[in-house]
Amino acid sequence: ALNLSAKDLVVGMELGYPPFEMSDKTGKASGISVDFLEAFAKKNGYKLVVKNIAWDGLIPALKTAKIDLIMSSMTITDERKKVVDFSIPYAKANLAILTPLNSDITNIKDLDKKGKVLALKRGSTGHLYAVKNLKNATINLFDKENAAILEVIQGKADGFFYDQLTIYRTWQKHQDTTRAILAPFQENPEFWGIAVQKGNAELKKELDEFIAESKKDGLFDSLGEKYLKDVKDTFKKNNLEFFF
């Protein structure tokens, strides 16, 4: 039955991180986050409206109430908590390393040496990690991750850090020039949360309850199977924790 009283739930995400947030062939928003929010909206009597917003514009859009929430594979950080409220975590991600195929890099310590070059995306968690923990390496920054990846492919850099999924997918495409080191090296994994406006306790509570339910009833498992089966299998084979 059509619920005529359904209230719009306006969601901001950057449709540039498949298979979490992406657009299908017709330009319609799709992916794990969209499926999850469709289910959330249905259960709570909302009508889902997705707005594709560039990453840097997401938090400003939330602060000015142009959107009700952000679900965009966003890591919960202390910095962000100052300006938005987060749901409980729905996923966790670890940084991984992409290195040239014939490099001598086997772990993070190998990169913390004079003469080692890192190609990193400016402002990414990999960039922040390197500044804090790798004092001896040279850090070269790029605005786009693809430019940083190219440095590794061409052998101009010894390492690129990004989330495990991106590193795995990049290695799949460039197996003749790169290697992926997927074992986690951070002390703490990164947790992803859904951001709501500061003080929006009601929406946060609904989201928290639905996330907890979805972990129990297998919604996240089935989304993982639907969108990331090969990755899930690879992670399992290598004893790596999956996102959910």
Regions found by a protein language model. Name each.
Residues 2-74, 82:
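Extracytoplasmic small-molecule ligand-binding "clamshell" domains
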Residues 15, 91-99, 164, 168-211, ...:
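Periplasmic-binding protein-like
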Residues 125-142, 179, 211-244:
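Ligand-binding clefts/hinges and TM-proximal coupling segments of bilobed small-molecule sensing domains
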Residues 100-117:
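Flexible hinge/capping segments at coil-to-helix
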Residues 12-17, 51-56, 65-77, 101, ...:
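Beta->alpha turn/N-cap motifs
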Residues 57-60, 72-82, 129-132, 153, ...:
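A ligand-binding cleft/hinge motif common to bilobed small-molecule-binding domains
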Residues 34, 50-60, 105-106, 140-154, ...:
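Short helix-initiation/N-cap motifs at beta->coil->alpha
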Residues 34-43, 103, 109, 122-124, ...:
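Extended ligand-binding regions for polar small-molecule ligands
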